[in-house]
Amino acid sequence: LVPRTWDDVLRAGPKLKAMGTPLGIGISPDGDSNYSLMSLLHSYGATIQDEGGNLTINRPATVEAVKVAAAIFKTGMTEDVFVWDGYSNNRLLASGKGSLILNAVSAIRAVETQNPALAANIALAPMPTTAAGAGGPRAIYVVGVNVIWKFSQNQDLARRFLVDLALDQRETLQRSLSYNLPPYEHAVPDLAALVDKDDRAQPPDKYRILADAPSWSTNIGHPGHANAAVMDVFNQFLVPKMFAAAARGEMSAEQAVKAAEAQMKPIFDHWREQGKI
């Protein structure tokens, strides 16, 4: 069984925690917590900014997402999620003492190598959504960026290389064990077939969900671009801090969202003045 909605996660949390296998969603100043909690926001249709780069964090959808996350923590998780690092959820999964984490496939790939019997009992699922499916694309993770220096003497050749690199990702997908998904649909024409039969997985079609991952995944800064302001918000961990304030009971969800807006507004104002939004 896998959770389809955040309500599923909320209902299951107390039972799983009572069994000694709590949920494991980081609420710490850490990259993985950023990815997880920004994805949770998107699940509810909440965003940091709109398509034009305007700050939109203080919305009812954000408050709802924060309330749900706080409830999930209080009933299904333990205090250590507030101090997690980038490997904490991996360790919880590998220990066999956690029931759910939010991470890339690298987490289960490690377990497949270290403990195949445990890996066979771990399922994969898309990022949960709301009952109404309000969020559309909801999962975010690392998006690679390549640049060409202005002083380069081989700019045309560099552009051709980057185009070829982006449009031929089959070997990259295979060598990364399905961790590095293609940036464009036709970069791996047989993506569905490749992830439908995985020799390392039990069952072999465990990674089938990756075939349509582009339909429920998006970039940091969605629905806008990953601009300087969004990355400042990311690097200062303002989203995890917002969730943590509510989960710890230091603020209500409404207060936590309003405080986050107050922290983010100067960042957006600064970068807009610099012409970076």
Q: Which sequence ranges carry the predicted segments?
A:
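C-terminal lobe and pocket-closing loops
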Residues: 106-118, 131-237, 275-276
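Short helix-loop capping/hinge motifs at secondary-structure junctions, enriched
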Residues: 1-3, 19, 47, 62, ...
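Paired acidic/hydrophobic, glycine-rich loop segments that form the ligand-binding mouth/hinge
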Residues: 99-104, 123
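Short, well-structured alpha-helical segments that form the helix of a local strand-helix-strand
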Residues: 10-14, 93, 253-265
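Bilobed periplasmic-binding protein-like "clamshell/Venus-flytrap" ligand-binding domains
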Residues: 17-30, 168-179, 266-277
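Extracytoplasmic/periplasmic solute-binding protein
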Residues: 7-55, 61-62, 98
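Short helix-initiation/N-cap motifs at beta->coil->alpha
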Residues: 4-11, 80-95
